[in-house]
């Protein structure tokens, strides 16, 4: 792993692990301590050759769920203030935010709300003139047609994904080496998705694979419990984490 990769990985971990504004970060929670980025950074044990810094924090981001880089080096983050359960009468207004480090100092200088009005966007992945978003029971494509970093077109790409347990709804979008979009589903979900090739079903945990240009959807792997991380190595083998693999 190169030094750049090590620094990048550590920076991303810091982004998800740390929040800077206690009042905003806790979102009215009072039963856990308020976060303290300075203290948390001081307590981290960092391996030789690695570096950790705070890239972005609340209020730039709120309860981030997933993040991915675009070819320009900007970081797209999906956030949800209502996760894991929206309250009766509450209007869903979760967001996708673009973070950019323009001066190269390792900290986000700008943040732009690319889209709002979402419901528990558990995945975001830049591509095809905008981004793909997991929006509860749907996969959306949000497009920016005029180049102002604001979504001006919203399209439902796929629908019919289960939502019995919001902790297990579809999540973690990744581009695969075959130009397909891979994403996860966990065990307490039953999905029945209509496609041009017929209804595709996944009852329980697994990994989906999707080719946007043809709307071809299939199940890449089954039998998981709480699939979360998914990455590919240099031989295109899948490396998958399961949060409850021992069950």
Please give the residue ranges for each predicted region.
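Bacterial N-terminal signal peptides that target proteins for export
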Residues: 1-11, 210
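Bacterial N-terminal signal peptides
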Residues: 9-19
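Beta-propeller domains with acidic blade repeats across secreted/periplasmic ectodomains
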Residues: 22-247
């Amino acid at each position: 792993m190169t030094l750049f990769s090590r620094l990048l990985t550590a920076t991303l971990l810091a982004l998800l692990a740390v929040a800077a504004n206690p009042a905003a970060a806790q979102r009215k929670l009072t039963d856990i301590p308020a976060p303290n980025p300075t203290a948390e950074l001081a307590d981290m044990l960092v391996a030789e050759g690695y570096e950790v810094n705070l890239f972005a924090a609340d209020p730039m981001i709120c309860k981030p769920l997933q993040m991915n880089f675009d070819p320009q080096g900007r970081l797209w983050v999906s956030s949800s203030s209502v996760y894991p359960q929206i309250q009766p009468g509450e209007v869903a207004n979760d967001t996708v935010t673009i973070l950019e480090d323009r001066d190269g100092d390792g900290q986000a200088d700008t943040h732009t709300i690319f889209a709002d009005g979402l419901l528990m966007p558990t995945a975001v992945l830049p591509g095809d003139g905008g981004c793909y978003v997991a929006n509860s029971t749907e996969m959306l494509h949000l497009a920016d047609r005029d180049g102002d970093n604001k979504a001006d077109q919203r399209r439902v790409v796929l629908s019919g994904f289960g939502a019995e347990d919001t902790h297990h709804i579809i999540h973690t979008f990744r581009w695969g080496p075959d130009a397909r979009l891979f994403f996860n589903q966990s065990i307490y979900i039953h999905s029945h998705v209509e496609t041009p090739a017929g209804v595709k079903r996944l009852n329980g945990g697994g990994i989906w694979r999707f080719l946007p240009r043809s709307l071809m959807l299939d199940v890449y792997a089954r039998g998981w419990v709480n699939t979360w991380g998914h990455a590919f190595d240099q031989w295109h083998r899948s490396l998958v984490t399961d949060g409850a693999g021992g069950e």
